[in-house]
């Protein structure tokens, strides 16, 4: 059966603690609010009158995202509304009462979408293969459909800084491209704007905050338990770097916001042929250069 933690307690834990330990959760909450607020401001994530849909999975990231947005909403410079939405994918042993109980206790407007994507994924994906890609596409489609039907203007996802860096290396290692996760983007069909307010937040801080708040975590039994996934391997690499070279992952995250196209080799982003004069004269293409090389090779 799925393990579920109890409902969250106030940040000020009533148990006897030293003054330093009493202050630490409050400092962490302040640090997270600052990071989330900074990301919202830097990328223009929330505008006046926005209806923000927080995609709530029951994991530590989405709980923290919702908690931060609720706190910021009280003092935000612009008015916006929140709705928490969970997709019940009909996974075996999924505790369907946990999220509604939590959200009612927090007085958060919410909806539960019931769609049996679990059966679809289990039927289509061979046993032992990674389910994450198909599961993600089906989940995204269901959430986009809800957003379209309910006037949602922003879709908030719980990806954090470490997710973004890990995606960069996933693309680098397995797809030979430089790409990560944008903090704000428009969906491929142009109908939805997706935001990632945790873009500046470290996963370790989220884990500590979730523990301090005693969120009722629901583990993912579908994909989270599969071993040897490429993303897990990259995650272990980043954790090792954090242990052996503190600050390295922070530097990589900052580098994603300081791109120099002219110092890369993407010909669609920079006019390399136009450098060095002679830009008005037509330049031979690769076939012209290779023809001479082929002739030399034939003579040899």
Swiss-Prot record:
GO terms for cellular component: cytosol. One of its GO terms (molecular function) is 4 iron, 4 sulfur cluster binding. Binds 1 [4Fe-4S] cluster per subunit. The cluster is chelated by three Cys residues, the fourth Fe has a free coordination site that may bind a sulfur atom transferred from the persulfide of IscS. It holds the Pfam family ATP_bind_3. A motif (PP-loop motif) lies at residues 57-62. [4Fe-4S] cluster binds at residues 132, 135, 223. Signal peptide: none annotated. Its EC number is 2.8.1.-. It catalyses: cytidine(32) in tRNA + S-sulfanyl-L-cysteinyl-[cysteine desulfurase] + AH2 + ATP = 2-thiocytidine(32) in tRNA + L-cysteinyl-[cysteine desulfurase] + A + AMP + diphosphate + H(+). Keywords: 4Fe-4S, ATP-binding, Cytoplasm, Iron, Iron-sulfur, Magnesium, Metal-binding, Nucleotide-binding, RNA-binding, Transferase, tRNA processing, tRNA-binding. One of its GO terms (biological process) is tRNA thio-modification. Coiled coil: none annotated. It comes from the Bacteria. Pathway: tRNA modification. It is found in: Cytoplasm. NCBIfam families: PRK10696.1 (NF007972). Belongs to the TtcA family. Catalyzes the ATP-dependent 2-thiolation of cytidine in position 32 of tRNA, to form 2-thiocytidine (s(2)C32). The sulfur atoms are provided by the cysteine/cysteine desulfurase (IscS) system. The thiolation reaction likely consists of two steps: a first activation step by ATP to form an adenylated intermediate of the target base of tRNA, and a second nucleophilic substitution step of the sulfur (S) atom supplied by the hydrosulfide attached to the Fe-S cluster. Homodimer. This is tRNA-cytidine(32) 2-sulfurtransferase. The gene is ttcA.
């Amino acid at each position: 059966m799925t393990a579920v933690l109890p409902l969250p307690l106030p940040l000020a834990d009533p148990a006897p603690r030293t003054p330093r330990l009493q202050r630490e959760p409050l400092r962490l909450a302040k640090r997270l609010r600052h990071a989330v607020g900074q990301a919202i401001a830097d990328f223009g994530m929330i505008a006046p009158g926005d209806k923000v849909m927080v995609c709530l999975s029951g994991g530590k990231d989405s709980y923290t995202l919702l908690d931060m947005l609720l706190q910021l909403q009280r003092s935000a410079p612009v008015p916006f509304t929140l709705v928490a939405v969970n997709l019940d994918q009909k996974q075996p042993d999924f505790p369907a009462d946990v999220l509604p109980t939590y959200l009612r206790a927090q007085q958060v407007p919410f909806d539960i979408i019931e769609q049996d994507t679990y059966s679809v994924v289990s039927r289509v994906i061979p046993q032992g293969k990674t389910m994450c890609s198909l599961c993600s596409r089906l989940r995204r489609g269901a959430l986009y459909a809800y957003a379209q039907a309910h006037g949602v203007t922003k879709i908030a996802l719980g990806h954090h800084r470490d997710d973004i860096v890990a995606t960069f290396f996933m693309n680098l290692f397995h797809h030979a491209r430089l790409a990560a996760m944008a903090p704000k983007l428009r969906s491929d069909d142009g109908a939805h704007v997706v935001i990632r307010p945790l873009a500046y937040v470290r996963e370790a801080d989220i884990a500590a905050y979730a523990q301090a708040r005693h969120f009722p975590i629901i583990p993912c039994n579908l994909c989270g338990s599969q071993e040897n996934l490429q993303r897990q391997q990259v995650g272990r690499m980043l954790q090792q770097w954090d242990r052996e070279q503190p600050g390295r992952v922070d530097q990589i995250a900052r580098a994603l916001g300081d791109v120099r196209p002219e110092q890369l080799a993407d010909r669609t982003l920079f006019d390399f042929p136009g450098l060095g004069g002679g830009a008005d004269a037509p330049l031979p293409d690769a076939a012209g250069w290779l023809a001479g090389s082929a002739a030399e090779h034939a003579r040899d």
